[in-house]
Amino acid sequence: MKHILVVEDDSFLNKMLSYNLTADGYEITSVLNARTAAEALRSREFDLVLLDINLPDGNGYDLCKLIKPEHPDTIVIFLTAND
């Protein structure tokens, strides 16, 4: 089963993404901030990371810079609600 990390600080959007992806058969780990995302990435491998750009304790770009050297095969898709 493919495992997806959802990193989104908007709790409603986080829950909706997680719900729909779970319904489609994916294993989901969902977190609300960059610190918890970094901890999750240290504990296991993910096939995909859905990554919010604006997080309360950092930004998705910086987190992606940490992800790719350690997990080069992990796909990262950025999410944002910015205009």
Where are these regions (language model features)?
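Acidic catalytic/metal-coordinating carboxylates
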Residues: 33, 59-62
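Two-component/phosphorelay signaling modules centered on CheY-like receiver
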Residues: 11-29, 69
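Conserved acidic carboxylate
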Residues: 8, 55
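Short hydrophobic/Thr-rich beta-strand motif most characteristic of the beta2 strand and flanking loop
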Residues: 25-34, 40
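Short, conserved "switch-loop" micro-motifs in signal-transduction and mechanochemical regulators
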Residues: 70, 82-83
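Short amphipathic alpha-helix used as the core "switch/output" element in two-component signaling
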Residues: 39, 61-72
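His-Asp phosphorelay/catalytic-motif detector in bacterial-type signaling
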Residues: 45-47, 71-75
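Active-site residues of response regulator receiver
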Residues: 52, 80
